[in-house]
């Protein structure tokens, strides 16, 4: 799956492709849409250093197919309509669209080579940040949009059976805190942070983006960016299908058969 900046960038770009009524809902509930762009990832940050029941929800919902996840959520929204919930739904759709198209490539590359999953994602975020003129990439704080009011956390909790509004609030708050810490400008602090995170898992140390690009990942960026562009092309059709399913219970097509990844 792509990392945080890729998801945020994708969702911001997809706003311009949305019909007027959907775009207006998203603008009214922009915080919910923006957090929705990270889908179930927020659970990974509930307590990133130890295994928890809430933390495991991230893996649980990522293993669901789009059919399973969106059918359940849309059923709930038909029974209890919520414009705020729909704004979050469209954000999650962006997350799903990008994850489902990019994740198989990331998995294949991490299995075939010496480069880890998280490292590939972090380097692709660097690629996008530099493409957007945000330099140095390793010092970019992308946490500004990761915030929800208590009542908005209750909206999000409806999407994830087993989660409470308080757990949602903690996940979002900690996600923002971690992203802010990862953007520290002090080199020694970055090294210490990488070592500390590495205690939990050697692979996790790759969350701390290094000052210079990793040459082992350079050949993967173009392939991932091609998939990113494919996701941009695919999104309008997914949005159309999801809208019909939400409104008329029309069936979701084969584009919703992959898992989140």
Predicted features by range, described:
Residues 1-89, 93, 97-261:
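N-terminal leader/auxiliary helical segments
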């Amino acid at each position: 799956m792509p990392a945080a900046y890729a998801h945020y960038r994708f969702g911001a770009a997809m706003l311009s492709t949305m019909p007027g009524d959907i775009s207006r809902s998203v603008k009214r509930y922009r915080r919910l849409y923006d957090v929705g762009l990270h889908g179930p990832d927020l659970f990974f940050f509930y307590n990133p250093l130890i295994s928890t029941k809430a933390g495991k929800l991230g893996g649980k919902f990522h293993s669901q197919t789009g059919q399973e996840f969106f059918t359940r959520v849309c059923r709930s929204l038909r029974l209890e309509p919520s414009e705020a919930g729909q704004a979050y739904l469209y954000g999650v759709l962006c997350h799903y669209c990008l994850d489902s198209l990019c994740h198989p490539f990331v998995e294949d590359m991490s299995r075939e080579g010496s480069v880890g999953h998280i490292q590939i994602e972090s380097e692709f975020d660097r690629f996008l940040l530099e493409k957007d003129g945000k330099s140095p990439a390793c010092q970019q704080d992308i946490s500004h949009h990761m915030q929800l009011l208590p009542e908005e956390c209750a909206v999000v909790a409806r999407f994830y059976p087993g989660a409470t509004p308080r757990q949602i609030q903690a996940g979002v708050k900690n996600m923002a805190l971690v992203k802010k810490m990862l953007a520290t400008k002090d080199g020694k602090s970055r090294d210490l942070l990488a070592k500390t995170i590495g205690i939990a898992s050697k692979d996790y140390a790759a969350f701390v983006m290094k000052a210079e690009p990793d040459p082992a990942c350079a050949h993967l960026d173009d392939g991932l960016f091609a998939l990113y562009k494919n996701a941009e092309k695919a999104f309008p059709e997914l949005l159309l299908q999801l809208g019909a399913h939400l409104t008329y219970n029309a069936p979701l097509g084969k584009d919703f058969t992959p898992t989140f990844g």
